[in-house]
Amino acid sequence: MNDYIVVKCGGSMLEQLNDVFFDCIKKLQQQYKVVIVHGGGPEIDAKLKDCNINVEKRDGLRVTPKEVMDVVQMVLCGSTNKKFVMNLQKHNLLAVGCSGCDGKLLQVQPVSEEIGYVGEVSYVETALLKGLINMNYIPVIAPIGIHDNEIYNINADTAAAGIAAALSAKELILITDVDGILHEGKLVKKTDESEIATLIEKGVITGGMIPKVQAALASLKMGVQKISIVNGTKDFTEDTGECIGMTVTRGVSIV
């Protein structure tokens, strides 16, 4: 059990998770060392609305001045992270919640001044993750990072990809609420970066699946070797630890 697996669960999925999801995490933990990264977009947007703070997005990223960053930190590192940890432990999965600023876990480079406190992962302190795992805990990471003693928001997909690449993880698993992509009436089980562009052009990949495959492509560029996009509301893990869903790698032909 030397291989690492990183599981990314978006904020919109957190309220949909059922017993099946936690059973799958247990199966993964029997075969691999598991790290979980979560988002929190819907809860952040709701809290910003409650605070009467307007939200602007550019290229899919939330513009994050200081007042927005304070809310993002409060939600991700507070309620969202702790509720997820408690849910895992309710299902007998020992977990420790932390953010990327704890122990300088996730160090970032700012994306741009125009977008505010938004960063991209530049360094991962893997010793902290390995230490928690060696004590039989599942690290549950809120995607917040640090740069020059300031706290930055990180897109959860890229945070998960950065962690997976730093750990040389066997696989990054992206949790969704759909089974995958249908091509000519069949579920696509394997694809690669070049064929994803073809499938988008043909209209096979549409709607909400487009950002998911784009996240997979970005992960490949960061050095992750294998990304699985799975339906977290169903059994997505074999007893062997293999995922049931769509796998994105390099050089696999399906079209």
UniProtKB/Swiss-Prot annotation:
Its main location: cytoplasm. It comes from the Bacteria. SUPFAM superfamilies: Carbamate kinase-like (SSF53633). Pathway: Amino-acid biosynthesis; L-arginine biosynthesis; N(2)-acetyl-L-ornithine from L-glutamate: step 2/4. GO terms for biological process: arginine biosynthetic process via ornithine; L-arginine biosynthetic process. The record marks K8, K212 as: Transition state stabilizer. The keyword Calcium does not apply. Substrate binds at G40, G41, R62, N153. InterPro entries: AceGlu_kinase-like_sf, AcgluKinase_fam, ArgB, Asp/Glu/Uridylate_kinase. It is found in: Cytoplasm. GO terms for molecular function: acetylglutamate kinase activity; ATP binding. Pfam families: AA_kinase. One of its GO terms (cellular component) is cytoplasm. Its EC number is 2.7.2.8. Keywords: Amino-acid biosynthesis, Arginine biosynthesis, ATP-binding, Cytoplasm, Kinase, Nucleotide-binding, Transferase. Belongs to the acetylglutamate kinase family. ArgB subfamily. This is Acetylglutamate kinase. It comes from Bacillus anthracis.
